[in-house]
């Protein structure tokens, strides 16, 4: 009887540990810090996007505009920061179900630069992410940049 209790207790503990790991997944995208951000003012809160497709540019512009960033799709020389897609690969595949749906997976890495001194601030390396996953990583990097705003 004691053996059965120990086996059941072991199974219960295994179930408890696996369910806890499902309840608390990782906290989101991992953005690598490269160098410190020089302080900037609200009037300098501007960024341009380079190396992204038109659809990705529009999505980033929409998200950052909601966070009160001035966003440009080309370098005019007035921007304080730059979001540069050093590499961006898009894989498309179709769901062969009743309603045909096309999915896109993004792989690559994007850097956030300070255009005032040319320093790379953050790097986000992503593999097989949806567009929302890529945007979440960029937003996380830009929120880290915002912490240096005076």
Where are these regions (language model features)?
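C-terminal partner/receptor-binding element of secreted or periplasmic proteins
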Residues: 121-150
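A structural "domain/chain start" motif
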Residues: 3, 18-70, 150
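Bacterial N-terminal signal peptides
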Residues: 10-19
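Bacterial N-terminal signal peptides that target proteins for export
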Residues: 1-8
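Conserved beta-strand termini and adjacent loop/short-helix elements that scaffold enzyme active sites
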Residues: 72-76
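Repeat-unit-sized solenoid/scaffold elements
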Residues: 28, 78-82, 142-150
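Surface-exposed short loop/turn segments
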Residues: 66-67, 77-128, 132
């Amino acid at each position: 009887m004691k053996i059965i209790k120990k086996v059941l207790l072991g199974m219960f503990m295994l179930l408890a540990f696996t369910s806890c790991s499902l309840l608390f997944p990782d906290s989101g995208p991992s953005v690598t810090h490269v160098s410190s951000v020089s302080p900037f003012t609200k009037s300098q809160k501007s960024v341009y996007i380079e190396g992204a497709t038109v659809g990705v540019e529009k999505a980033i512009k929409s998200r950052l505009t909601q966070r009160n960033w001035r966003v440009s799709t080309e370098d005019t020389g007035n921007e304080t920061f730059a979001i540069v897609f050093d590499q961006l690969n898009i894989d498309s595949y179709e769901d062969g179900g009743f309603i045909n749906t096309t999915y896109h997976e993004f792989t690559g890495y994007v850097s956030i630069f300070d255009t005032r001194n040319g320093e790379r601030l953050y790097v986000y390396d992503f593999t097989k992410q949806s567009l929302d996953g890529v945007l979440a990583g960029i937003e996380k990097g830009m929120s880290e940049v915002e912490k240096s705003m005076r």
